[in-house]
Amino acid sequence: MKIQAGQLGLDDNDVPGPLPDTDSKPSSQSQNDTPMFKLGNFESPVLKELSRRTVNKEMETQRIMTNVIAFAFWNLLVKFIKFFWNNTHVGRQFCNRLSRIHLYMLTFHTLKKANIIYHTTFSWLNAELLDYLFHLLISLNILFSLWKLLSTVKVSDLNLTDRQKKLLGVDMQSSVDTGLQPQHPHYVSTSKISQMAQNKTHIPQTNLKNHPAYLFKGLETPLKARQREMAEEQTKLQSQSLHTKNVFGTLQRHSGISSTLVSANNDNNSPHTPVTRKGYIPSSKYAYMMNSQSPRGKI
C-alpha cells in the first residue's frame, strides 16, 4: 500500500500531497519548446519591383528646387569674390598678405617640395575649372530629375490584372504598349461618385417653387404648412395689386413702356404727375397753390 500511496501522491496517513515529479511552475525548457507565433516578412516581388520603378514626384521636385537655389547661390558667391578681390582696397590688401604668407611658407623644405609636386601634377586644376565642374554637376542633376518626372513607368511586363492595377493605383485609361503611368496608390477617383450624387439630389426648378425641400422626405410640420400657405396668399395678393392705381398714377413700371396719367375717375383738382418722373412728387394738399394765379415779378 505504501508503494501505491506513493504512486498516487498520498502519504502514510492517506493525506494527498504533491507529486514528486510535478512542479507548480512550468520549466524554462518547456517554455522554449513551445513555438512563438511570428509575423512573416513576405513581400510580393511584383509590388517590390513596382515600388522600385515608381517615381517620387515630391522628392524630385524638391531636388530640382535645391539645385536651382545652389546654382544661384554659387554664382552670387563667385561674383562677390571676384568683385571683392579686384575692385576693393581691402581685397587687394588681403591678396597681398596671402601672397606674402605663401612665399614665407615656401622657405620650408617640405612645403617647397609639396608645392613643386602640386604644380607638376595638378597644374590643370584651377578656379575656372572648379566653377565649370560645379555648373555641370548641377545641370546634370536638374536634367535627370526632369527626365524622371516626365518619363512613364513601364509596367506592362509585370502582368498585372485589372484588380491589381486598381489597387496599386495604375491609370488604366492612359495605357499604352510602352507602359502605364502610375498614380497615387489606393487612390479612388470621386468624379463619378460626385456626378451620381448630383443627379440624385437634383430637383427641378418647378418643384422648388411649389414644394420646399426638407431634410426628411415627405416630412412637413404644421408650422411649415402654415408658412407655405401664408406665402401663397401673399403672392396672390401681390399679383392682384399689380394693376392698382393711386392719385399719382400707377406705380408699376414696365420695362420699355411708360405709364399713363391719372384716370378720369380721379379728382380734377389733383395734380397730374407722370409715373416716369424720377424727381420730387408734390403732395396733394398743396394742389391749390399750383392752380392759383400769382403775379410774376418784373425782371
Curated annotation (Swiss-Prot):
<dbReference type="Pfam" id="PF08058">
    <property type="entry name" value="NPCC"/>
</dbReference>
<feature type="transmembrane region" description="Helical">
    <location>
        <begin position="133"/>
        <end position="153"/>
    </location>
</feature>
<keyword id="KW-0811">Translocation</keyword>
<dbReference type="GO" id="GO:0006606">
    <property type="term" value="P:protein import into nucleus"/>
</dbReference>
<dbReference type="GO" id="GO:0070762">
    <property type="term" value="C:nuclear pore transmembrane ring"/>
</dbReference>
<feature type="modified residue" description="Phosphoserine">
    <location>
        <position position="292"/>
    </location>
</feature>
<comment type="subunit">
    <text>Component of the nuclear pore complex (NPC). NPC constitutes the exclusive means of nucleocytoplasmic transport. NPCs allow the passive diffusion of ions and small molecules and the active, nuclear transport receptor-mediated bidirectional transport of macromolecules such as proteins, RNAs, ribonucleoparticles (RNPs), and ribosomal subunits across the nuclear envelope. Due to its 8-fold rotational symmetry, all subunits are present with 8 copies or multiples thereof.</text>
</comment>
<keyword id="KW-0812">Transmembrane</keyword>
<keyword id="KW-0813">Transport</keyword>
<protein>
    <recommendedName>
        <fullName>Nucleoporin POM34</fullName>
    </recommendedName>
</protein>
<dbReference type="GO" id="GO:0006913">
    <property type="term" value="P:nucleocytoplasmic transport"/>
</dbReference>
<feature type="modified residue" description="Phosphothreonine">
    <location>
        <position position="273"/>
    </location>
</feature>
<dbReference type="GO" id="GO:0034399">
    <property type="term" value="C:nuclear periphery"/>
</dbReference>
<feature type="modified residue" description="Phosphoserine">
    <location>
        <position position="270"/>
    </location>
</feature>
<feature type="region of interest" description="Disordered">
    <location>
        <begin position="1"/>
        <end position="39"/>
    </location>
</feature>
<keyword id="KW-1133">Transmembrane helix</keyword>
<keyword id="KW-0472">Membrane</keyword>
<dbReference type="GO" id="GO:0005643">
    <property type="term" value="C:nuclear pore"/>
</dbReference>
<feature type="transmembrane region" description="Helical">
    <location>
        <begin position="64"/>
        <end position="84"/>
    </location>
</feature>
<dbReference type="GO" id="GO:0005640">
    <property type="term" value="C:nuclear outer membrane"/>
</dbReference>
<feature type="compositionally biased region" description="Polar residues">
    <location>
        <begin position="25"/>
        <end position="34"/>
    </location>
</feature>
<dbReference type="GO" id="GO:0051028">
    <property type="term" value="P:mRNA transport"/>
</dbReference>
<dbReference type="GO" id="GO:0005635">
    <property type="term" value="C:nuclear envelope"/>
</dbReference>
<dbReference type="GO" id="GO:0017056">
    <property type="term" value="F:structural constituent of nuclear pore"/>
</dbReference>
<keyword id="KW-0597">Phosphoprotein</keyword>
<comment type="function">
    <text>Functions as a component of the nuclear pore complex (NPC). NPC components, collectively referred to as nucleoporins (NUPs), can play the role of both NPC structural components and of docking or interaction partners for transiently associated nuclear transport factors.</text>
</comment>
<dbReference type="GO" id="GO:0030474">
    <property type="term" value="P:spindle pole body duplication"/>
</dbReference>
<keyword id="KW-0906">Nuclear pore complex</keyword>
<dbReference type="InterPro" id="IPR012578">
    <property type="entry name" value="Nucl_pore_cmplx"/>
</dbReference>
<dbReference type="GO" id="GO:0006999">
    <property type="term" value="P:nuclear pore organization"/>
</dbReference>
<keyword id="KW-0539">Nucleus</keyword>
<feature type="modified residue" description="Phosphoserine">
    <location>
        <position position="294"/>
    </location>
</feature>
<keyword id="KW-0653">Protein transport</keyword>
<keyword id="KW-0509">mRNA transport</keyword>
